[in-house]
Regions:
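N-terminal secretory signal peptides that target proteins for export/translocation
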Residues: 1-7
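Bacterial N-terminal signal peptides
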Residues: 11-22
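Sec/Tat signal peptide C-region and signal peptidase I cleavage site
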Residues: 24-27
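Histidine-/acidic-rich catalytic cores in large beta-rich domains
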Residues: 29-347
Length: 347
C-alpha cells in the first residue's frame, strides 16, 4: 500500500534534518568529538562480561589485520573466529550480522558475503557477493535456509537454501541512492508472518514487504539501522542518529530511548537492539564513526541494557587484552529462551 499520511508528515521533519546536513550514508554517522572526553564512569552498572553469556561481533575494527567475533560465557571469552580485514581482492571485510544457532553453528555476514561456520571453525556454507555488491544481512530461517539482503544496484533480498546452494526466493529492494552501495542496508528481518521488514538507511524509512516484493507497510524514520517486529506487534527501530523507538502498527511511538536518558555515559551510533523476554532492551553502541582515534575507543561503552522504565542495568566496556571485544555491532544473548533460527528471539 502507499505510505500513510503519517509517513508523509514524518518525512517533513526528515527533510528538515537533511537540509541541515544530518545524513551521511557511510559509517561516520556522527562528527568527531574532542578527545579524550569522559565517556563513561569508572564503575558501571551490572556484572560486566558476566552479566549474560553472549555472541558479539563488530564492524570495522581497523586496529588489527583480522576481524574477530567472540562467544563469552561465565565472564570469559570461550570461543573466537576471525576473518581478514581485507580479503584477497583487497576489499574491506567486517562482521555486520551474526547468529549462533541451536546446533552450535554461526551464520554471519561479512560485507563481502556471508557464511556458516561450525564450532570447530569449519566453513559449512559460503556466499561471495559479486564485485560492487555488499552483504550486511544474514538471518537464519530454520537450520537449512539463510535470508540475505545484498546492497548494490540493484539491491535485493535472497532466500538461500544452504543445503542445495540454490536461491529459492528473491526480489529487488528500492533504495535512496543506487550508487551508494555501502549506505543502503545494515539490517532486515523476516517476520513470523512471513514478510520482510527492512531498515532503509538511505531512504529514511522502515518498510515491510510481502514475498512478491510489494510494500505492505511503511514508517518514516531518520537513518534507521535496524528494525525488528516484536511479538506484541510493535516494531523496534534503531537509528544511527542515536535513538531507539518502539512504534505501534499505526506508527505511534510507544517507547523510546536516547542519549538524554543516560547522561552519565556517552553513546554513539545505535546499531542492533534486542528486546529481551523480561522486557528489557539491549543496544549495541558503535564508536568508530565518532571517535576517529582508536586510542580513545577503550573509554567507550559498547553495549547497554535498559529496563522499560529506562533504568540502566548493564553497561559493557571490555577493551582489556584478555577480552578486547572491539567496536559493537551484533550482540546475541545466549540466555534468552527459544531457538534463534525459528524467530523466537527479538533481534
Amino acid at each position: 500500500m502507499k505510505p500513510s499520511s503519517r509517513l508523509r508528515k514524518s518525512a517533513l521533519w526528515i527533510a528538515a534534518a537533511l537540509s541541515l546536513g544530518a545524513i551521511n550514508s557511510g559509517h561516520a554517522a556522527e562528527g568527531p568529538i574532542a578527545a579524550p572526553v569522559e565517556l563513561s564512569p569508572a564503575v558501571l552498572p551490572g556484572k560486566g562480561l558476566a552479566q549474560h553469556p553472549f555472541l558479539y561481533a563488530g564492524e570495522w575494527d581497523h586496529r588489527y589485520p583480522d576481524q574477530t567475533m567472540f562467544v563469552v560465557r561465565d565472564g570469559k571469552v570461550a570461543w573466537t573466529y576471525s576473518i581478514k580485514l581485507k580479503d584477497d581482492a583487497g576489499q574491506i571485510q567486517e562482521f555486520s550480522d551474526a547468529t549462533l544457532l541451536s546446533n552450535g553453528n554461526i551464520v554471519f555476514a561479512r560485507k563481502t558475503g556471508a557464511a556458516l561456520v561450525s564450532p570447530e571453525k569449519k566453513i559449512l556454507w559460503n556466499y561471495d557477493a559479486p564485485p560492487g555488491f555488499e552483504v550486511h544481512v544474514a538471518q537464519p530461517i530454520g537450520l537449512n535456509r539463510v535470508m540475505l539482503v545484498q546492497n548494490g544496484n540493484p539491491a535485493k533480498m535472497m532466500m538461500v537454501n544452504i543445503a542445495t546452494g540454490k536461491t529459492e526466493t528473491e526480489f529487488k529492494l528500492p533504495v535512496g541512492n543506487p550508487a551508494g552501495t555501502h549506505g543502503q542496508f545494515r539490517r532486515a528481518r523476516m517476520t513470523l508472518a512471513g514478510t520482510l521488514l527492512a531498515a532503509h538507511m538511505d531512504n529514511n524509512k522502515v518498510a515491510e514487504y510481502d514475498m512478491s516484493g510489494n510494500e505492505v507497510w511503511a514508517l518514516a524514520v531518520l537513518s534507521p539501522w535496524a528494525a525488528v517486529r516484536l511479538k506484541n506487534g510493535n516494531t523496534l527501530v534503531t537509528s544511527n542518529r542515536g535513538f531507539v523507538k518502539e512504534f505501534s502498527p499505526k506508527g505511534d511511538v510507544v517507547w523510546e530511548f536516547s542519549q538524554q536518558d543516560v547522561p552519565s555515559i556517552k553513546l554513539f551510533n545505535f546499531q542492533e537492539a534486542n528486546r529481551l523476554a523480561n522486557g528489557n532492551t539491549v543496544i549495541s553502541c558503535w564508536c568508530p564513526g565518532a571517535l576517529k582515534d582508536p586510542k580513545d575507543w577503550p573509554n567507550s561503552v559498547q553495549v547497554i541494557e535498559v529496563t522499560p522504565q529506562k533504568k540502566l542495568v548493564w553497561a559493557l566496556r571490555s577493551w582489556d587484552a584478555d577480552a578486547n571485544l572491539g567496536p559493537a555491532t551484533c550482540i546475541q544473548l545466549l540466555d534468552e529462551p527459544g531457538k534463534p533460527e525459528d524467530g523466537d528471539q527479538q533481534r
